[in-house]
Amino acid sequence: MAELNDYSTMIDILLSDMDLETVTTKKVRMALKEVYAIDVESQGKAINKLIRKHLDLVKERPRFERSLEDLLKENATLAIELTKEITVSKRSSGEEKNDSETKGTHVEKKKGTVSKSPISTRKVTLSKSLASLLGEHELTRTEVVRRLWAYIKAHNLQNPNNKKEILCDEKLELILGKSTNMFEMHKILASHMTEPKKISDCPPLIQEVRRKEKPIVSDSEQSDTKGI
């Protein structure tokens, strides 16, 4: 059971992005399978029990308080990132004003017309070493994990005697060190992913450059606009 408890942090992260009124243990289990790129069905009953335990804890308290309190115990760095994401998400979505709208959304989901992705689709900016390895500067956290596991499997970097241990090659060593395990890897990855900066967060010179990148309006278009 100690091995199963290593999934706790990721279960918390997944639940923080799910609709708690429609979430099922199967959704979380399938998300775990997708993130870790491993078969969790053989441990289905035990994992379901662990998921239900976390889900009960989540429903006892407000979502943002639960994620902060629990994740701080296991991964302070990741918890700080999640705090920033939660704050930005609440401000941009107007979470406090959408209670009535949420109920309507639940009705649509039961009809099968609307479904919420079980994993966050918010992209993050990758460090130079991680971007060089994965070939992208921005990806979702889930896609980072998926591509990294694809690389690990393609280059046979798992210890044959202990599949949880990863024996890094030269490229991967720049990111994870000489060796790591499948659970510690996700904590290390947190330091290689940051939220993309908005224009307002950039230095004045860069702000000016980005503003000048707006599409140029032709003279004819300008005259048409004035006529309107």
From Swiss-Prot:
Pfam families, sorted: DEK_C, SWIB
GO molecular function: RNA polymerase I cis-regulatory region sequence-specific DNA binding; RNA polymerase I general transcription initiation factor activity
SWIB/MDM2 domain mapped to chain residues: 119-195
Domain of life, source organism: Eukaryota
Keyword Membrane assigned: no
Residues carrying Phosphoserine: 218, 220, 223
Free-text function comment from the UniProt entry: Nonessential component of the UAF (upstream activation factor) complex which interacts with the upstream element of the RNA polymerase I promoter and forms a stable preinitiation complex. Together with SPT15/TBP UAF seems to stimulate basal transcription to a fully activated level. UAF30 seems to play a role in silencing transcription by RNA polymerase II.
Protein name, per record: Upstream activation factor subunit UAF30
Species annotation: Saccharomyces cerevisiae (strain ATCC 204508 / S288c)
Gene from which the chain derives: UAF30
